[in-house]
Amino acid sequence: MTQTPPPAPGPSGVRQAVRDIPAYPFTPIDVPYKLDQNENPYDFPPELKQKAAERMLAHPWNRYPDLHADTLRAAIAGYEGWDAAGVVITPGSNVLIKILTELGGIGQTVLTTDPTFSVYTLEAAMLGAELVLTPLNPDFSLPVEATLQALAAHAPGVFYVTQPHAPTGHSDRPEDVRRVVEVADRLGWVTVIDEAYSQYAGTDYRELVRAGKHVLSLRTFSKAWGLAGVRAGYLLTNPELAGHLQKLVSAFTINFLTQAVIETALEHPEYMRERVAEAIAERGRIYAAVQGHPTCTIFPSNTNFFLLKTPDADAAYRHLLEHGIVCRRQDKLRGLDGCLRIAVGTPAENDALIAAILALR
């Protein structure tokens, strides 16, 4: 008598790649000083919340929003000086990374540096792309020659170059960025310049995007704009490439509540610029206070966070928690032994942070 084989563990329809990938690594911790997610420490101004609320109340809630957020795309295009047909917006840039992998990475190659933003690698693994990582140089700079070799050695897929870099906070020389982007574009790679933190660095690679055929800039409202809770990210590229990407975006994906908030923010960018200026000043103040520490090293940063190298990341992390500060451990990443990633907070939060770091031994 033939025996029925035992069922496979877990739901039979789940792909092995999905089974093998861990959930996104984040556990919220309730402490007075939340410096673990590179957030803007300030909420959206109350008067702008009121303006956004008035927009929401004027809209019929029983009707679907724009199919592809055309009104909001036009507003972003006006702010960026871009063709609206070359703007794609989704609920957070993480969604854009997913559709970029769907566009050019499934069964092909995703190439970036090591370490890198974890969502690049998670989406590559989830969607069955070959992941190629080129280790950063010891000073955290882009490994230009190794990157060029990797671009030439693999069939084109998706190439990410992050400026400034996460999680190190380092900005590369514009000529190095230009060199790898132009080669990648010429070889047919979908080339993504992730500019999530560009306001804190004063960098802008839109001209590289304009000059390229397969190049795009990835941007977000979560950092400098202080709208992480709204969930909105966008990209700038040419209309042809944007049209292909738009096919992968679900219909009606941007609700009118999000549209109301983002449109209001774009009409009042001065609040964002003021907060970026404060963050840059506070970043410098923290660096000046900590750089002479006897056992810890603070690395220069062009973002709203910085890396702190400690003798023992676990002990340092627990020390900061005891002082009411939560940050993010990075010590398991290549080249970041002993490192913690800490966001720049309000002046009061930074006072507490500086005192806690100076007490570390």
From Swiss-Prot:
Entry keyword annotation includes Transferase: yes
Entry-annotated residues carrying N6-(pyridoxal phosphate)lysine: 223
GO BP annotations, alphabetical order: L-histidine biosynthetic process
Pathways per UniProt: Amino-acid biosynthesis; L-histidine biosynthesis; L-histidine from 5-phospho-alpha-D-ribose 1-diphosphate: step 7/9
Amino-acid biosynthesis recorded as keyword: yes
Catalytic activity: L-histidinol phosphate + 2-oxoglutarate = 3-(imidazol-4-yl)-2-oxopropyl phosphate + L-glutamate
Family: Belongs to the class-II pyridoxal-phosphate-dependent aminotransferase family. Histidinol-phosphate aminotransferase subfamily.
Subunit and interaction comment: Homodimer.
Name of this chain's protein: Histidinol-phosphate aminotransferase
Lineage: Bacteria, Thermotogati, Deinococcota, Deinococci, Deinococcales
